[in-house]
Every structure is written in structure tokens, then in C-alpha cells.
Curated annotation (Swiss-Prot):
Species, as recorded: Rattus norvegicus
Active site: residue positions: 455
UniProt-recorded name of the protein: Tyrosine-protein phosphatase non-receptor type 6
Main location: cytoplasm
Keyword Repeat: yes
Ligand binding (substrate): 421, 455-461, 502
Residues that bear Phosphoserine: 12, 59
Amino acid sequence: MLSRGWFHRDLSGPDAETLLKGRGVPGSFLARPSRKNQGDFSLSVRVDDQVTHIRIQNSGDFYDLYGGEKFATSTELVEYYTQQQGILQDRDGTIIHLKYPLNCSDPTSERWYHGHMSGGQAESLLQAKGEPWTFLVRESLSQPGDFVLSVLNDQPKAAPGSPLRVTHIKVMCEGGRYTVGGSETFDSLTDLVEHFKKTGIEEASGAFVYLRQPYYATRVNAADIENRVLELNKKQESEDTAKAGFWEEFESLQKQEAKNLHQRLEGQRPENKSKNRYKNILPFDHSRVILQGRDSNIPGSDYINANYVKNQLLGPDENSKTYIASQGCLDATVNDFWQMAWQENTRVIVMTTREVEKGRNKCVPYWPEVGTQRVYGLYSVTNCKEHDTAEYKLRTLQISPLDNGDLVREIWHYQYLSWPDHGVPSEPGGVLSFLDQINQRQESLPHAGPIIVHCSAGIGRTGTIIVIDMLMESVSTKGLDCDIDIQKTIQMVRAQRSGMVQTEAQYKFIYVAIAQFIETTKKKLEIIQSQRGQESEYGNITYPPALRSAHAKASRTSSKHKEEVYENVHSKNKKEEKVKKQRSADKEKNKGSLKRNISLTPCRGLRWADRDL
């Protein structure tokens, strides 16, 4: 479900264009109040390098695009058109994609703010917590720009023994001030919550609702992550447990690890025990890499301690990158490692450990000395050259099967050497630059297979590197103002390989790395936007090739002066005469505005309504 962060309360048409061109990618969109028709809204969408504006009608009974399907809430309308790609299109057939919400900044950096959430979802979270007077704040689904304070009471919902009742209190934003009704208004959501934490809120019945224990969110608008890092660094109010928010989030993550009950039977086989560096760090069966071409009559012959890992939080059309998370090689597994690299067509290997650290063997060298060649099982590997940088060593290797020496593949081996023996790097710049080089290499090889990432156990540093790269890719794909959830991303990765991201320090390092990545990206954007005529494509943030080239022939002009800039939205069964009249009227009224006729492909819409209690 999309976050409602795409609704921008105080944004004009020209400002929306500037924002979408400067911070969005093709397919980015946002919604804003109509400055022309009170109660209506405007949907602004980036199409190629221009911006299209579509009016959303609020009839009082339903929302629609002046034609097409009708919906109970604006959220349902937007979700429908994001899920049903191809519904919105110009008369010339150009598709208008709603793909990536360009979210506004959260109204507060407080962690009790959860953004988009239905009443039912809030109830489930609070009732599962089970502590009376736990509260959270979320977006209003029925009234864009307003909010809801959801609080778990100390009385059951119905009969004794039933779940505790949840009270939902509407928080209205009027004239830039916040109120729950009555004469009291506040400058910010934070001020409102802090006030009622002290006084409680009196219901119409005379009973009081108290705000005692916040239910913290882990979701955050990517552009606001620096503020979230500051919040997580704060100590708890209780002096006897002076733990920062990072500790809280990581402990919560650890408690959820028990939910990953996937089997690991192959790694437990007696014949495979010698292939595991650590006897209890084993691959899940459902996602393990299976060595091909092995004798099925030999138990365990297809086993290697490695798992496929994919970013399942991105859609199939948004992400093509797959990783293999593997343990560091043992003497007994080097041949299997090269078998895996060959069968998966891997061209990039990422090693995040030294061979020996603090006198302990972390990974046996599975490559030959520079300028030499060596046979590993069924494959010959040559170390063609090595290049040293301040942070890492790059080896250029060649691999070929012994039975076909003419078939040669080049593999780039990146070994990160600046990770300390204990803890994490003191700053993330080196890791970000390292990943930038890796991604440039992988992207230059269009048919390359998964990137193999390993450390020693294949879960701590390996998980940290993979999660950072996934989050960078999410921001690169969806734009700087997308929602990210680091805890949820780690949960998703842990469901594919157990124990990924091992320590609180690694957890915090991910936050700090993504914060620096986003800050650097913002600065690059500012520089590029100041250079007239250049496309908004910067650093690691690149547009998906399919989106870059889509509808390249569409000719569009943008409004620079008009407050309201709209597409004319018509259903396909509308008469052309009406369209021509609208075109003529717009031509006189909004010179310089974007004037394209949008047709709605007839399709039945969703008819459910999300609760906003």
C-alpha cells in the first residue's frame, strides 16, 4: 500500500513542476489541493522530462478524474491508477505512468508518526502490543492533510477477554495549526502530542484518553533520514535504561528473528558439516544455491553454504539485481565456489574481509597469485592483474572450464580492506564509493549474473553491504522522497538468509550510510539543477533505461506562470466536440500551460474503503 506522503498541502502548480523535475524521475507523482476549485485536488505526474497535471474531482460523494472510475477516497483513486498501469493515456497513445510517489516531508521527525496507515492496521499493531495507553499518529485517509491519533485504551473492546479498545481521534490542520477540536491549537503535531501527554484527552463521554507509551515506526521519508538518525541517537527518558533508539529498533528486529522458521536440512546433513565454516550458520533450503551437474547419487554433492537474496520490496519491473550471500571459502569448498560462480554467470565478486584478521582465518585465498593460473576442480582461474586503492583491492580474473579452454569469462574481484577487525568503519564514505564502483561495473555487463557477496560467515558484513546497496537502489529507482524502512528491509533479507546484519553497530551503520548517500545526492542534484538544460540524472541516481526512452516523441511544454495547469481528462466515450471546446477554452485561458488530452481506458475500479476511524 502506498504512503499518503504524496499529498502536499501547500504546493502550487509551478512549484509542483519544479519539485518533480528536480527531485523526481519519470513516473514520479504527487497530489495537492486545487487552487481553483475548493475541495478538488490536482495530480501532478512527471512524464519524461515534463510534468502533466490532472484534476481530481471531489463531488462530495466520490472522487474521480472527471470521468472514469469513481472511488470513496483519494487514496483508493491513486492506488488504483498506480496498480492499473496503462489506464491513463493521451489521445496520441502516450501512457501516463503513476509509479513513484514523490512524498512531502513528514510533519514531524518523532518516531510515533507512522504516515500512511488504516484504522484497522493501527488497531492490529496497538492490540498486539497490549500495553494500555500506547499511541501512534497516522495520516487521515478520509481527509488529506489531516491526521489521526490512535490510542489503546485500558478497557476491552467488547466482552471481558476481548482485545482492548482502540480510540481514534481526528487531528485537524487548519491554517497551519493543529487541533483535536475546541479552542486549543498548536504550532506542530509534536506540540499537540506533548501537551496531551501531560493532560490527557477528554472524550465526549467524560472519560479520559492518556498518551503514555509511543508506538514507534521504522518507516521514514528518505529525504528526512538525517532527522531520524538524530532522533535514534537520543537516549530514552528513563535514566536507568539509557539506551538510544538504535538499540530499541535492533532489539525489536532480533525478537522477530524467531518468525523465520525456514528449514535448513541440507546444511545439517552429516556429509555437509565439513563444508560449513560455522556449524550453526546454515543456508535456508528454500533459497539456497544448488550446484548443478552433480551426481544425485552422492548425498550433499550439490551443497554450498550460500543463498540467493533479492530485494522483494521492489516490484519485478523496478529491480533486476540479485545477490548471492555466501560464507567465506574453506579449503574444502573452493572448487564448489568456482562452480557456483561459473553456473550463475557471476562477473562481480565482493569480499568484505581480509583472509586473516586478528590471527583468525576468515577466508582461504580462492584465487591464484597475480600473473599466475591455477586449476580449481573443473575450472582454470587466472589472476590477470591487481589494482590497489586506499580502501580496496581490485583483481581482474579470468575463468574457463577445463573441457573448453576457448570459453573465457572475466570476473572482477573487489576486496574491501578497510573494515576494522571489530565494529564498523568510522564513516561510510569509503563503503559508498566502493559500492559505487561495484555497481558501475555490474551495470556495464548487461548479461551478468548475481553479484556474489561474502565475508567470513556470510551474514554480518555481507548483510550490511547488501542492505545498504538495496536501499541505495530503492532511492535511485523511486527518487529522494520515497519511503524507506531499514528494519523492514533487514527482515526481508533475513527471510532469505538467516542472521543477516548481526550487530547494533552494523544496524546503525546502515542508517548513517544511507543518510550520507542521500545528503550527497541532494548536493549533486542542486549542482545539476543550477546548470541549465541538463537532465536530472546524477551520480548513483539514474533513471531506469526503460523510463528514459519511453514516449521520447511526446512534445510537451510546462507552465511557468499559471497557478493551475491541467490535463483535460475524458472518458473514451466522451464526444470529440466536447474535447475541442475544452481545448479552445484552455488555449485562451492558460497560454503556456501543458495541454494534452488524456483518455481513460474503461476499466472497473476498486470499491473497497479503507477505514479512517
